[in-house]
């Protein structure tokens, strides 16, 4: 009954003011368009919320990004890794690299956004939650429709998932190299270990490749990986890793 009411089209009866004169008749098509747009928008939002709620409990089997990548590279075997089976230093490293205030914000890091706007920089300020929304539900690339959907999905994810669930899903769908998706595949392919066995150095190097997984080598130290290792230690001390 609920689903039937959800998808039932809006009533299109003639407005009560149809007999009020030619002015009311002239606005009738616009009013009908607005009614249909509102009906579609509310149903789309409800479906998005249902999908987010499902993935709060069910692990996403694949993503559009993985499907697209499979056309150019073989996809390494992916085994889902629960958050408790990922080394704490790996969790801290990816947060230090991608979103140091992950435990403190509600999906959008407004302080970082203000810094970007004030500096006039073209760099992004996407949080891990925003990246999870993009990686799980949407597609890669820059476009206003995708950004709009990401902006809707992000607070839904924050409302319906725990911080640990967000990080777990992110680490299981993130790309760490050509055809290598998820922390389980990355730990196995690059270091021959399980995610629980990753060292601080390995975790920092894996986190360092995330902005450009097709061109960066997690077997090579870099200034970025050293900075991430320091950042992971810092957020462990100052409490910004408490939710992990």
Model-derived segments and spans:
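Juxtamembrane regions of bacterial inner-membrane/periplasmic proteins
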Residues: 2-244
């Amino acid at each position: 009954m609920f689903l039937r009411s959800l998808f039932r089209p809006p009533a299109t009866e003639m407005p009560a003011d149809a007999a009020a004169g030619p002015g009311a008749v002239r606005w009738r098509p616009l009013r009908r368009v607005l009614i249909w747009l509102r009906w579609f928008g509310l149903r789309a939002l409800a479906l998005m919320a249902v999908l987010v709620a499902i993935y709060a409990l069910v692990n996403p089997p694949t993503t559009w990004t993985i499907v697209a990548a499979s056309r150019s590279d073989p996809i390494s075997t992916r085994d889902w890794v629960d958050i408790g089976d990922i080394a704490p230093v790996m969790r801290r490293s990816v947060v230090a690299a991608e979103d140091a205030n992950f435990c403190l914000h509600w999906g959008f890091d407004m302080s970082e956004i203000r810094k970007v706007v004030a500096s006039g920089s073209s760099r992004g300020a996407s949080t891990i939650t925003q990246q999870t929304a993009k990686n799980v539900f949407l597609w890669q690339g820059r476009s206003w429709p995708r950004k709009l959907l990401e902006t809707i999905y992000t607070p839904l994810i924050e409302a319906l998932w725990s911080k640990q669930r967000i990080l777990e899903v992110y680490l299981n769908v993130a790309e760490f190299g050509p055809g290598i998706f998820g922390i389980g595949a990355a730990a196995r392919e690059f270091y021959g270990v399980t995610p629980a066995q990753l060292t601080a150095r390995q975790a920092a190097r894996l986190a360092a490749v995330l902005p450009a997984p097709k061109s960066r080598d997690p077997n090579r130290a870099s200034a970025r990986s050293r900075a991430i290792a320091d950042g992971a230690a810092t957020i462990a001390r100052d409490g910004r890793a408490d939710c992990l």
